[in-house]
UniProtKB/Swiss-Prot annotation:
Annotated catalysed reactions: L-seryl-[protein] + UDP-N-acetyl-alpha-D-galactosamine = a 3-O-[N-acetyl-alpha-D-galactosaminyl]-L-seryl-[protein] + UDP + H(+); L-threonyl-[protein] + UDP-N-acetyl-alpha-D-galactosamine = a 3-O-[N-acetyl-alpha-D-galactosaminyl]-L-threonyl-[protein] + UDP + H(+)
Gene Ontology CC entries for this record: extracellular region; Golgi cisterna membrane; perinuclear region of cytoplasm
Lineage: Eukaryota, Metazoa, Chordata, Craniata, Vertebrata
Binding site for Mn(2+): 209, 211, 344
Disulphide-bonded residues: 106-339, 330-408, 442-459, 482-497, 523-540
Annotated metabolic or biological route of this protein: Protein modification; protein glycosylation
Impact reported for residue 155 to N: No effect; specificity not affected
Consequence of substituting residue 465 to A: Little or no effect. Induces a slight decrease in activity
Regions of this protein lying in the Lumenal compartment: 29-559
Protein name (Swiss-Prot/TrEMBL): Polypeptide N-acetylgalactosaminyltransferase 1
């Protein structure tokens, strides 16, 4: 009898599981039908229907989405809306699975239980429903609940209806408090973030862009660094989400933030000195001279103490370098935490328009940061970008007062101690155009890349591509590239500056006006008939075609 009773229990249990499986199968089948009927970009049904999709669906584990050939034209049209593959994004679950891309040593790290709480501030303007909500769900699903104080969504005057009441209704159902704050008029990223920070309540503010995906274990290492030192500002490794396929690709832990001559943020290899400081342990945070600006965490009170953002800046652009300089020069630390990974959709073009034009806004913002933080080195930037000096940059007295109040260090200290491998040469003999006496043409990098030939073109006096520096190391430099000659008669190419002299060593004679390549013993010459857009290098003759005028060659060295 006992055996028979036992069998009945087993059969009954099995029947329950079979019925449950059938119910779930029917449930998700109906859910998928609902999604097929819903308006593009808008959810249908309740939260469970929206979020739960089988994990073998499109884009799961970060795999690329393939659009069928018959939908390619529609895909291209939809792409224009947000400048990423909106069709692919809408095919992917809002809580899609992602690979764990952390270093193995990161996966076993143990963090304190009493980490500070954070408010996650996300600014959006006409963002796609799928990318915005995927950002929100990734924060909720991959963060310890007790560490998330709230999520603050700041709407920078979006015009799309589904980002109004439907969004507010949706986020009310989530298990984490989500507040939607509306800007009364288009204000830009900087002021919208300031609004979000002002209403936040967490001990830490974490800023994210509206098209991100957080991965497993992303938050704890960020908060742990701030708990260790509240003056530490931390960024995750920014992984790449393809704007074409939404494939998730791990970012490198061997790059950090810098900037070029035009004050554009750039990624550069982590230098050996930083590897030595960490004793080769790649799981330790990297001290970075600058941050990309889209994703970072900062102690809420410290954010106020160091002056938040410069509210005199407009929309977007330059604010990331401004806050980076300020953090370092005023006693803080800026790190990339290599055990934290957050994906970001990198677009090739922006879908947004800016009042007054993008260039005018960025010039104003860069002028403000240069005037407040770069001391005498601002003149280097102005020679590169003379148009910046023509913009009205507003009143900076409060920012200069902040610098005095915080007793911040000079920019020369920053270059020497934080960013000694900066592309700005600290010692140089000339900066500006290099003009050929005979042809009246100037050297021009033509916006070409490494390993390409340097160009020569009519002088335009607008800086930019025609600015070269003859450095104290006797290099002819354009940003991080130096003129290099590896064989007799050229060509003259642009290679990464290595500071080892050799093929990048040039001797300028201020009397003869010649630029002699020391290794080949030949002189820089005008272009030839065979190639009229590149300078040549030939045996030195002293002819006018080998004479060059270096702009500002009498400038004293900057120390």
């Amino acid at each position: 009898m006992r055996k028979f009773a036992y069998c009945k229990v087993v059969l009954a249990t099995s029947l329950v599981w079979v019925l449950l499986d059938m119910f779930l199968l029917l449930y998700f089948s109906e859910c998928n039908k609902c999604e097929e009927k819903q308006e593009r970009g808008l959810p249908a049904g309740d939260v469970l229907e929206l979020v739960q999709k089988p994990h073998e669906g499109p884009g799961e584990m970060g795999k690329p989405v393939v659009i069928p050939k018959e939908d390619q034209e529609k895909m291209k049209e939809m792409f224009k809306i947000n400048q990423f593959n909106l069709m692919a994004s809408e095919m992917i679950a809002l809580n899609r699975s992602l690979p764990d891309v952390r270093l193995e040593g990161c996966k076993t790290k143990v963090y304190p239980d009493n980490l500070p709480t954070t408010s996650v501030v996300i600014v959006f303007h006409n963002e796609a429903w799928s990318t915005l909500l995927r950002t929100v769900h990734s924060v909720i699903n991959r963060s310890p609940r007790h560490m998330i104080e709230e999520i603050v969504l700041v709407d920078d005057a979006s015009e799309r209806d589904f980002l109004k009441r439907p969004l507010e209704s949706y986020v009310k159902k989530l298990k984490v408090p989500v507040h939607v704050i509306r800007m009364e008029q288009r204000s830009g990223l900087i002021r919208a973030r300031l609004k979000g920070a002002a209403v936040s309540r967490g001990q830490v503010i974490t800023f994210l862009d509206a098209h991100c995906e957080c991965t497993a274990g992303w938050l704890e290492p960020l908060l742990a660094r701030i708990k260790h030192d509240r003056r530490t500002v931390v960024c995750p490794i920014i992984d790449v989400i393809s704007d074409d396929t939404f494939e998730y690709m791990a970012g490198s832990d061997m790059t950090y933030g810098g900037f070029n001559w035009k004050l554009n943020f750039r990624w550069y290899p982590v230098p050996q000195r930083e590897m030595d400081r960490r004793k080769g342990d790649r799981t330790l945070p990297v001290r970075t001279p600058t941050m990309a600006g889209g994703l970072f965490s900062i102690d809420r009170d410290y954010f106020q103490e160091i002056g938040t953002y410069d509210a005199g800046m407009d929309i977007w652009g330059g604010e990331n370098l401004e806050i980076s300089f300020r953090i370092w020069q005023c006693g803080g630390t800026l790190e990339i935490v290599t055990c934290s990974h957050v994906g970001h959709v990198f677009r090739k073009a922006t879908p947004y328009t800016f009042p007054g034009g993008t260039g005018q806004i960025i010039n104003k913002n860069n002028r403000r940061l240069a005037e407040v933080w770069m001391d005498e080195f601002k003149n280097f930037f102005y020679i590169i970008s003379p148009g910046v000096t023509k913009v009205d940059y507003g009143d900076i007295s409060s920012r200069l007062g902040l610098r005095r109040k915080l007793q911040c260090k000079p920019f020369s200290w920053y270059l020497e101690n934080i960013y000694p491998d900066s592309q700005i040469p600290r010692h140089y003999f000339s900066l500006g155009e290099i003009r050929n006496v005979e042809t009246n043409q100037c050297l021009d990098n033509m916006a070409r890349k490494e390993n390409e030939k340097v160009g020569i073109f009519n002088c335009h006096g607008m800086g930019g591509n025609q600015v070269f520096s003859y450095t104290a190391n006797k290099e002819i430099r354009t940003d991080d590239l130096c003129l290099d000659v590896s064989k007799l008669n050229g060509p003259v190419t642009m290679l990464k500056c290595h500071h080892l002299k050799g093929n990048q060593l040039w001797e300028y004679d201020p009397v003869k006006l010649t630029l002699q390549h020391v290794n080949s013993n030949q002189c820089l010459d005008k272009a030839t008939e065979e190639d009229s857009q590149v300078p040549s290098i030939r045996d030195c003759t002293g002819s006018r075609s080998q004479q060059w005028l270096l702009r500002n060659v009498t400038l004293p060295e900057i120390f």
